[in-house]
Curated annotation (Swiss-Prot):
GO terms for biological process: eye pigment biosynthetic process; protein targeting to lysosome; visual perception. Gene3D superfamilies: YVTN repeat-like/Quinoprotein amine dehydrogenase (2.130.10.10). The gene is p. WD repeats lie at residues 62-101, 109-148. SUPFAM superfamilies: Tricorn protease domain 2. Pfam families: Beta-prop_HPS5, TPR_HPS5_insect. Keywords: Pigment, Repeat, Sensory transduction, Vision, WD repeat. This is BLOC-2 complex member HPS5 homolog. It comes from Drosophila pseudoobscura pseudoobscura (Fruit fly).
């Protein structure tokens, strides 16, 4: 039968913790535990070190502000902590009274607060997440063979869209949970994915659940979800099932079994609890963590919750702690830190194990009351656990104390013990029983199962690492999202930066690369940790299984496949990822690279992209890689390819263009432009070769390059072209730049055309004819005002010249168009 559990060994550390505090104003703010220490951070900024029994050991002063988070490294050598002043600090644990505490500090952005810290198994690195949604890796450096730290470096890894809630890691896998989603990263393979596709809003934790027997129970990831639900996820990032504990928690809370004098009213209170009507609980778990090998611990401000996620059941929940702030786990021991600064610990123990402990401690009456509270459990357990015969000692005690009512209540347990011990004696004395035992043993040896099926409500999980059992995902519902990781550690150092703000996952195709050519990094990591003889034999047998003959793929096809994956990753992460394919592009000549881009575009079309979108994707990859100055060196066909791509990428920005009535040249337009520097170099090349027609072809398609054309005309002192371009372009920065080289007469012409422009009459740069446009078309992108225009003019003219031009064109200037500040500037300038 399934075991039942209770919380025992209650310890209150409050008295021990209060001794080192010399002032009532100093409060503990956070804590962490290890095998050797309990360490607290305080509002004073200091660290307080205790041993596991609560004895005070050491005080580490700190003047960098109140401590908000802290974490102890796996080997107990270092303590990483953060402060309210946006600092990350690392303390080298040294309990020597003569040694000066060594603390190294790094400053963060003042607007950012660290939300969680997590050490890896490597003593020289840890992660931290902040309120901005950024995850960083901190690497420590020290003298070889010494614990003396030299420096620590911070490397950004992830930029998410909300504060980080919890971080966990397993080997090269990194699990990050923020307020909207969970991200699973494989830092070794530079891949990561979002777990599930349903966003959430709130602080929900996630953790790894590593199995010691991989072949029996595969390792999993568990992610808290709204509504007291928990996702069970495999190491491929796929949600296997959802555990719903909302209704299962409509039960009485567990009482902490305190080894004190027996309360005569305890039984009455427990019976009253059973009569109460407990409602389903809608809970939010901001942190989940593994408890021992089998259970998952979660907590809220009002209670502890322990789940058996393997069997989808509630072990127990307890509401005897008030205002819980944080919890930590060590083996089966749970440490609870409250908002009042108190620390308590309890231990999770089976009921029958606790009863035997009470017997060994000679607390017989307390043990008898425990049996009365759980009569059915102990009666069933006594029939299969021979060790419980120790409880027979209670019978004599109850008779001696004349506790006949209590003896009668638990008599069924003694009957079960007698039945168990009698069966054991019969088994030892009966040859037939021996033969039966032998037969049953042989049946177990050949794999015949005599157990019943799983009880109702228990999930039977499939082995995610057995390919012949796992259902193959359909291509139409594949949710993997491979992204480029900006930083790596261990074998590779941090290389790239990236940004994730994906609100929904993009569809990728798993069959891009055949199975024989494709690595499955998330499964490979799990396979390395399969332990035991059964697991090893399974791996060997898989290796011997004949693999199907994979189709041959040429190196060029592999390159195209890789480029396709990089492109899709870049779209999802909103980064260029140019460093990932720069080395590939460097191996090709210009003409060969153009041909490769054509094949890549064709592959994108085959996998669902439109022809134009595929070409745009290829052009973006090429332009992100291309150095614009290389336009001077490439051949004409490559240059034409670049010009065509530049026009294609900027086509959407050119949809709303007001054109000349006479020659259709752009008059008003949106001056936003992609790869403006590339277009500027392209125009300079054409202009230097006297290929003005090609310049005008590009500018007519992408009028945002007219600012480059204005500078060409300005160098030739062709003001008839410069002034219309500057005024039609509608960018104050261009007027500021060009205005430095205009004299008074040129500014007079500029005033004249600006007045005409305010009347809706625009001069074409190409044919120099005047076109009339509607007022709404004029103001759609136009942001010059008389006040802005005159202030720019005053920067380059004297006050008297500016005022005389204003007087000349005063009939065209509205009364309220000029601010008082302008006239004040004129007076100051003289």
């Amino acid at each position: 039968m399934a075991d039942e559990y209770c919380l025992t060994n209650f310890i209150d550390f409050s008295l021990s913790l209060s001794l080192p505090l010399k002032h009532n104003r100093i409060k503990y703010t956070c804590f962490d535990i290890s095998d050797s220490y309990i360490i607290f951070g305080a509002s004073s900024g200091s660290l307080y070190l205790f041993n596991r029994n609560g004895k005070f050991l050491h005080l580490i002063p700190n003047k960098h502000g109140a401590i908000t988070n802290l974490s102890i490294s796996a080997n107990n050598k270092y303590v990483a902590f953060s402060t309210q002043r946006s600092l990350i600090c690392v303390y080298v644990v040294n309990l020597s009274a003569q040694a000066t505490p060594q603390v190294i500090v790094t400053h963060l952005d003042q607007s950012v607060q660290v939300s969680c810290i997590h050490w890896t198994q490597d003593e020289k690195q840890f992660y931290y997440g902040d309120s901005r949604g950024q995850v960083n890796l901190v690497l420590l450096s020290s003298f070889i063979g010494h614990s003396l730290l030299l420096n620590m470096t911070v490397h950004p890894l992830l930029y998410l869209d909300s504060p980080i809630v919890q971080i966990d890691d397993f080997e090269s896998l990194l699990l990050v949970s923020n307020c909207t989603k969970c991200i699973l990263c494989n830092t070794e393979y530079e891949e990561y994915k979002q777990i599930g596709n349903r966003p959430r809003d709130g602080a929900y934790g996630a953790c790894f659940f590593i199995s010691p027997h991989e072949s029996v129970q595969p390792s999993r990831i568990y992610c808290a979800r709204p509504g007291t639900r928990i996702w069970e996820v495999d190491f491929e990032g796929e949600v296997i099932q959802t555990h719903q504990f909302k209704t299962a928690l409509a039960t009485a809370p567990a009482k902490i079994q305190k080894t004190t004098n027996v309360d005569n009213n305890a039984d009455e209170l427990d019976s009253n609890d059973e009569l109460l009507d407990y409602q389903p609980q809608q809970l939010q778990f901001s942190r989940v963590q593994r408890l021992s090998h089998d259970f998952l611990l979660a907590y809220t401000e009002l209670g502890l919750y322990i789940f058996d996620v393997r069997n989808s059941s509630v072990v127990l929940w307890c509401n005897q702690f008030e205002r819980i702030l944080d919890c930590r786990v060590s083996g089966m021991e749970i440490f609870v830190f409250t908002q009042t600064g108190s620390l308590y610990s309890v231990q999770l123990q089976t009921l029958h194990g606790y009863s035997i402990t009470l017997m060994h401690q000679s607390k017989l009456l307390q043990c008898a009351n425990l049996l009365r509270q759980h009569v059915k459990y102990f009666a069933d357990k006594a029939r299969e656990n021979y060790e419980l015969k120790l409880l027979n000692q209670l019978k004599q005690l109850l008779i001696e104390r004349q506790e006949y009512e209590l003896l009668n209540d638990i008599s069924v347990i003694f009957d079960a013990i007698a039945q168990c011990t009698g069966t054991a004696l019969d088994t030892q004395s009966s040859g037939g029983s021996s033969a039966a035992t032998e037969r049953s043993g042989s049946m177990r040896a050949i794999g015949v199962s005599t157990t019943k099926g799983p009880p109702k409500g228990v999930y039977v999980l499939e082995n995610a690492f057995c390919d012949n059992l796992k259902q193959q995902p359909k291509s139409g519902h594949f949710k993997d999202a491979l992204l480029t990781v900006t930083g790596k550690f261990g074998k590779n150092i941090i290389k790239y930066k990236f940004n994730i703000f994906a609100e929904e996952q993009q569809q990728l195709v798993r069959e891009l690369i055949p199975a024989s050519e494709r690595s499955l990094p998330f499964k490979d990591i799990k396979a390395r940790y399969e332990s035991g003889d059964v697991g090893e034999e399974e791996i060997v047998s898989r290796c011997k299984r004949p693999t199907p003959q994979a189709p041959h793929i040429s190196p060029e096809e592999k390159t195209i496949y890789n480029l396709y994956l990089i492109c899709k990753s870049a779209k999802f992460s909103r980064t260029h990822c140019v460093e990932r394919y720069r080395a590939v592009f460097d191996e090709y000549a210009a003409s060969e690279l153009i041909a490769l881009m054509g094949k890549l575009a064709q592959l994108m079309v085959e996998h669902g992209d439109g022809q134009e979108q595929a070409e745009r994707n290829c052009y973006e990859m090429y332009f992100n890689y291309l150095n614009p100055e290389l336009i001077w060196e490439v051949d004409d066909s490559t240059r034409d390819y670049i010009a065509s791509g530049f026009v294609l990428l900027n086509a959407p920005q050119c949809m709303e263009i007001v054109r000349c009535d006479h020659c259709a040249f752009p008059l008003r337009f949106d001056n936003a432009c992609q790869y403006h520097e590339l277009g500027a170099v392209l125009l300079r090349y054409f202009w230097s070769r006297n290929e003005q027609l090609k310049c005008f072809d590009v500018v007519q398609a992408v009028p945002a390059l007219l600012d480059v054309l204005a500078k060409f005309y300005l160098a030739e002192q062709n003001l008839d072209k410069v002034i219309p371009i500057v005024l039609n372009y509608g960018q104050p920065e261009l007027l500021l730049d060009v205005g430095r080289q205009l004299n008074v007469s040129a500014w007079a012409r500029c005033f004249e055309q600006f007045a005409e422009l305010q009347r809706g009459r625009l001069i074409c740069v190409n044919c120099e004819c005047v076109s009339s446009v509607e007022q709404d078309q004029l103001t759609r992108h136009f942001f010059y005002t008389w006040n802005c225009f005159l202030n720019i003019a005053l920067d380059h003219l004297t006050a008297s010249d500016t005022l005389s031009l204003i007087f000349k064109w005063s009939s065209y200037i509205p009364n309220d168009a000029i601010d008082r500040e302008f006239y004040s500037r004129c007076l100051i300038k003289g």
